[in-house]
Amino acid sequence: MHHFSNIKDVVAIDFIKAYAEHLKKSGKLEIPEWVDTVKTGMCKELAPLNPDWIYIRAAAIARKVYLNNGIGVMALRRAYGDQYNKHYNPSHRTLGSGKVNRYILQQLEKMGIVAKIQSGRSLTKEGRKDMDKIAFQVYKEHEAKVTPMILMPMN
């Protein structure tokens, strides 16, 4: 049986959902007035439809900082970019929104989850502990769902 050691041991989407819920419940993430109207990149035509999209993006960015120490806004813009297609021209790769990613990093800094370093952003000890705690909860929930299936007798 595999033992939990860190965030890499859980499925990314499950962790992001759980951590987004944790950020929402904490109430520390300030929601800007432009959250309902902003596009997340030049390639997008509309603002995100999910009302909790900013919590999900914040959780995903926090996970990226956890996995990539020293990540910056430009790397996040590349990660959240997409194909831009004007229908009559060949599509091109575009960058995601710098403002959205920068704002979320600044909010995570205010919350004490990430800190600025020379090469970008890094996770704080408190941020790592907090994320590992949520990841462990996700791991336990997943283990509880999977274990009974393994132990069932075969007929």
Curated annotation (Swiss-Prot):
It holds the Pfam family Ribosomal_S19e. GO terms for molecular function: RNA binding; structural constituent of ribosome. PROSITE patterns: RIBOSOMAL_S19E. Gene3D superfamilies: Winged helix-like DNA-binding domain superfamily/Winged helix DNA-binding domain. One of its GO terms (cellular component) is cytosolic small ribosomal subunit. One of its GO terms (biological process) is ribosomal small subunit assembly. It comes from the Eukaryota. The keyword Heme does not apply. It is found in: Cytoplasm. Keywords: Cytoplasm, Ribonucleoprotein, Ribosomal protein. Transmembrane segments: none annotated. Component of the small ribosomal subunit. The ribosome is a large ribonucleoprotein complex responsible for the synthesis of proteins in the cell. Required for proper maturation of the small (40S) ribosomal subunit. Belongs to the eukaryotic ribosomal protein eS19 family. Component of the small ribosomal subunit. This is Small ribosomal subunit protein eS19. It comes from Entamoeba histolytica (strain ATCC 30459 / HM-1:IMSS / ABRM).
